[in-house]
Amino acid sequence: MKFQYDEFNPNRFEVHRLALDIIEPNSRVLDIGCATGYFAKQLLTKHCETWGVDRDKSAVKKAAKYCQKVIVSNLDEVTSLPVPKKYFDYIIMLDVLEHLLHPENLLSMIKNNLKDNGKVIVSIPNIAHASIRWLLLTGGFEYADTGILDKTHVKFYTKQSSQNLLNKCGYKILDTVPTNGMCKVPLLYKITDRLPVKWQYFIVKKIPTLFAFQFICVARMTRTRIRPAIKK
């Protein structure tokens, strides 16, 4: 896929900032789907060592400026990545899995590259967001160049199904963080846009399955099989 991002979004309750805040300083990070290195650049401010992976050669050339090493790879076709085993504190995949035909293969493959106490950080668009529900209610479902219905997405996830995917691949969910999607809500956005962002996010956290634009799942490897999440 072509990279969509070449700038870091610093907004407090958006995916880039929320994911960055999770990562501890001086960590070793594998950024899968690194694009132009916009996120790796921010990790430098936290004195992290970042390795980048992306299928777009032109993006990887730009990312090399901020990464210890960069790798060009089609994630749907590889069975391993040329990176050290048990090396990384974090493996991040920001808006990556929904572009893959077999995301479970990647999630299983990278476990060997995490330290024993390492974590994966995955962000996935929320197909159950209010804007998509409204489209379905009114008979629409049009793909777009960006967003939840990005035309390059081949998989769609809810909060529950994204957690189930990670569980099935041998991860234990430590946290699931919603991103602010209030500005995308049909009919309500003219009202919610007037609210302070922290108030918007308060509403999102109260009803995340409806108002979160994405979910950021933080997980750790487990040796025991995790049962799929049950909707409550």
Locate predicted features.
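Conserved N-terminal segment of class I S-adenosyl-L-methionine
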Residues: 1-86, 90, 104-107, 138, ...
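A short glycine-rich, Lys/Arg-flanked "PGG" loop and its adjoining helix->strand segment in the class I
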Residues: 107-119
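A short SAM/SAH-binding and catalytic strip from SAM-dependent methyltransferases
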Residues: 90-101
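A SAM-dependent methyltransferase catalytic signature shared across enzymes that methylate proteins
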Residues: 162-177
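Conserved class I S-adenosyl-L-methionine
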Residues: 122-144
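Acceptor-substrate binding/catalytic loop of class I
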Residues: 144-161
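Short N-terminal helix/helix-N-cap motif within the alpha/beta-hydrolase-1
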Residues: 101-105, 132
